[in-house]
Amino acid sequence: MGKPTLLEPGHLYNVPAEHKNDIPIHYIITWIKQRLPEFGGAIPTSLADRVLIIKSRTGSGKSTALPVHVFRILRNENTHSFQKYLGRSVICTQPRVLTAVTLAKDIGASTHYPDMILGQTVGYQTKPLTEKPNRGLIYATAGVLLAQLHTMTDDEIASRYAFMIIDEAHERALGIDLMLMYIKSMLERMLQRGSIGALRIPFVILTSATIDTHKYSTYFGIGKENIILVEGRQFGVETHWPLYNTNNYIKTACETALTIHKENIHDRPTEADILIFMPGMGEIRFLSTLLNNANMDLAKEKLPLMLILPIDSEAIAQENEAYLGLKAEIKNLWVKNPLTAKVEKPLRRVIVSTVVAETGLTIETLKYVIDPGWNRSVETYYPEWAGGLITRPAAQSRIEQRKGRVGRVFPGHFYPLYTKHVFEQIPAQQYPEIITEGPGAIFLNIVVETIKKNKEGVFKAEEIDMLDPPPTDALASAIERAIVGGLLTRGEKGLQLTQLGDIASRFSFLSIEEARMCFSGYFWQAAISDIAIILAVVSVVDKKLTNLLDSKQRNGAMLAEAVLAGIPPFLQHIDNAYTNIHLLLADDLLEGLFIFEGFQHAIVYFINNKVNNLAKHLREWCEKKMLKYSSMVQILARREDILNELAIVGLNPFHQWQNRLASANAETFLKRVCTLKQCIYEAYRLNCFCYDEHRLLYTGRNGIHFSYHDTVIKNPSCIVTPRIMLAPVSKQYMEWRLEPSFVSVLDGFVNMDINFLLPRQEIPNILGGVEDEEEEEPPLPIQVFLHNYVKTHFHFSGKSFKELKMKPSQMIKFPETTLINMIPDIPKNVVQTYLEINVCHQYSFKRLIYCETFYTNMDDVQHENAVELIGLPMAAHHLTINDFNKLYRVLKPDGFLIVYDLHNSQEAYWLHSLQDALGHHTIRRDMDFHTITEWETIFKECGFSPIFSKQPSEHELFIVFKK
């Protein structure tokens, strides 16, 4: 086995010429020591003294040799291993559990590092698995360090860690981007404290094989001298490009693996394994079935067999048979002959894996990689806030990582299932999750960190200091949800956290909606344990409740049995129990609550009976109920996380324990159902949808619609769902439809705030007539302001507003409640909120009037603020005559009035309201006005002069009057 290139001379580049032939690790350690005061270096004064970027190709030892040698800076290499290390630690973050655990175990078992002993000087810390020393080299998932940065002070972090190594820094998960934001802010704060803070400031090292060095160095404000480039593997990797693309990559992957196996039948078992990447577990199962069938053919031909190992995050967490087979030596493994049923030694392992095997994992027997070139990740689309798992071509950087799994200890082979031309067309880097998903659960963390840097203590969007800020539409949607959830409010100087927002910002892993539901639980006196279970079900279960069932033949009967296992005793003996409970609850989330309650009953039963191997009995119970054991365990863990989060911030996680829904009786059951539904509604009320009897669809305020059918509950008038999912229409074509994830029926359970059902529309081109692509769009005053403001303050990932080539009305698509709130310091003389007036019938979008000052209600309208009104089409609900009186009373002296698309039956209502408001001439209600002249005549009698008018068609007109 060759040494990692970090330990061999002559692999450095982008360094001074006299150091080209240095051993890379020696050069790196010397570079670091020169900047440490304890080794004679100066006290750090800038980030350049504490941030180093190492772009080191796969196979160089950046995940193994580098952390060990950095740790040896702190612990003398010659120190006896039995002497306990008491200094500060080195933390090396990994994007996945598998790599963190594997690297720590491999280093602890390696003869190359006798001073690194697992549990004493090296260890791992992940959410599900931990074995680490109090001080030493700690491999951890990024989430572990993120949680510490979120909850600990700068000094606490500095006293714990001397070095932070962010391995695979090119990964752009939300947590990693937030972690880098935290780290940068911490370093800046400690540097601002002068020598007192700078002496113990941690050293940060970013490592990756495919990192964009320019982007990261610019973000941290460091120069080229802080970037070290190291060559990678010593052994070549041959790429076998196909002549044609495939239209069935699973079948082609199987055929390719079988061809490799047959053509290389004389491979040594220690240099023979195949790794195949698949985008998801469904594809892994399908491919594993095909490969096992191929083993049957091999057995018939009396050829050596393959051992098929399906690997994903679940297999790693459970350390199942496949994972143990991955970690074992090939000589100790056996495979069953499908013909003779006898066991025999396999020639090679075929590892079928998701992206968990993409980075930081070394399989020393791996010789071949087969890559279909796909990647599956969550994408969310705003402002509709609809998302789902989308399968797209993997970026070139990810493909290089996959290719880098081979060629580490002997030459390897890479088999892409796409042509070289296709590879050259796909993006070089993956899109960051903050772009594809939006800020999501980390939004409040971003707000808090941004507020810390603002002298006035307010949140300003343009001050977000991240590698890539959230997209404007995603940011606007997040602000809206935070305001509606009561976590953000507008102060005199900008957006500020409310008291609830301050509490919510202390949560490490709770989203806006999760925090709001917990707060609502305390307000409505709900059992917080029930709230935690509901949120855990939403977090773990994908799309619908039947996905909890561990069976290909999922059906209502299986789901019914699982639900009935957890219902209150008084309901267990009624006829048609599930049907009646389904009618009674009208709620997928509450049914999920009962499914988990049944699982909890089983836990209590087995514990009370003192069974041996509790996990085995629970797994058997889940198999009997057709439930996924792994999902139930994840719900249990997530529920505990939520309850712990509440306890950490000082809230009682056992609040109203005695009022749990599962313990209700006939008298209290419906009351508790209503209470929980109220909490669900308050958390997700922006996702309310009403049934449109004419279109036979559910429509919401976002302008989106979907169909929803329940076999028992027929077309409820109003439902709420935690999220809108993108569901594939067919496997053959990349087409998607919208569908709710879980449904909670509100009819008769919750008194809704109807204002949250107002649809949102794009700002139209009112004054410009029909849009002509050849002509510049005449912008509205509000658009002019936003155009100039956005052009000045938002950069859109490096592109100016002009470069985007978007017209204002195309650009500004924000909901009415956030169009202005997203811009924290908007001048007072610019429009800041809206007052809705309904002048339309059921199916038309008519108008929205907004004023120049933020009003909490109509009573706050003052004359001097109502200088100008501009009409926009927007559906709204009826205001009362008193509301009209208040509005037009302040308009009478010098205001504008707009008539837009008013005709037929609605004119009587409008004119009657206007008559009462203005107190002018009697207006005949039976008059039908269809022309500009007719409208001008009647409003002239009321003291208004037309200053602009247009009538595109018989039933469309637009008039601006001035008092």
UniProtKB/Swiss-Prot annotation:
GO cellular component, one term: host cell membrane
PROSITE patterns: DEAH_ATP_HELICASE, HELICASE_ATP_BIND_1, HELICASE_CTER
InterPro entries per the UniProt record, alphabetical: DEAD/DEAH_box_helicase_dom, DNA/RNA_helicase_DEAH_CS, Helicase_ATP-bd, Helicase_C-like, P-loop_NTPase, SAM-dependent_MTases_sf
Renumbered ranges of motif DEAH box: 167-170
Record protein name field: Putative RNA Helicase B962L
A GO term, aspect molecular function: RNA binding
Leader sequence segment: none
Primary localization class, coarse: host cell
Organism: African swine fever virus (isolate Tick/Malawi/Lil 20-1/1983) (ASFV)
Family: Belongs to the DEAD box helicase family. DEAH subfamily.
EC numbers, comma separated: 3.6.4.13
SUPFAM superfamilies: P-loop containing nucleoside triphosphate hydrolases, S-adenosyl-L-methionine-dependent methyltransferases
Localization, UniProt: Host membrane; Virion
Transmembrane region(s): 521-541
Keyword Transmembrane: yes
Membrane topology: Single-pass membrane protein
Catalytic reaction(s) noted: ATP + H2O = ADP + phosphate + H(+)
Class of enzymatic activity (EC top level): hydrolase
Helicase ATP-binding domain segment(s): 43-229
Binding, ATP: S56, R57, T58, G59, S60, G61, K62, S63
Domain Helicase C-terminal as annotated: residue spans: 253-459
Keywords in alphabetical order: ATP-binding, Helicase, Host membrane, Hydrolase, Membrane, Nucleotide-binding, Transmembrane, Transmembrane helix, Virion
